[in-house]
């Protein structure tokens, strides 16, 4: 297991359990978020879609103090054409985080969706070479990433990478390829918080999620935290959510990030109620 150390500026993040990385509509009340956005010990983050920040009367940095590109840091967005690198969208969010001195999360290195289509045409050996090249390119571009979603949505029935054989396939643990991905990420970013991220974790596939993350942890994978996507919270009671979160945390005993929280309404009053 990797040593739990990160760059000094973000060292406190590993103790922020649960910290929040929300994909949600912004509330109209900036005052409610201003206290969190200026708190150095915790953060409430959001996504940026096509770098849609600081438009209108409310500035992103007054509402949130963490940023994640929704699509711009995915492999297909950056290398849709083989060796045709497009870093512009990711650069915008990365530089914005630097400017305002809050964490940037890279989402994501390995996923069974939004990866380059040309990868499917390659042999397993060539796929591995391309994965190495991809991670090396990200490392060269962003050597100081504080947080990384290393693998996304690999619970059975979700979207495990079709190219997983290039990383060793299921192997003895059933998730050898995920372990390999974390090892490769740790080699390049030994001080980053390395995260496994998935959905349906609070309700429908909680046990499968726990099994996957626990398998990684017990196998010695350099995983620092897990992200529980929160798309399914809108119709979940507070007591049920608390019970599910306690069950997950007791089983895994690792830092948790509540990620990708959606509030499917444009009604500000209802959004405020949901946040509370």
Question: Can you describe what each PLM-predicted range is?
Answer:
Residues 64-71, 146, 152, 196-198, ...:
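Aromatic- and acid-rich polysaccharide-binding/catalytic face
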Residues 2-19:
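Bacterial N-terminal signal peptides that target proteins for export
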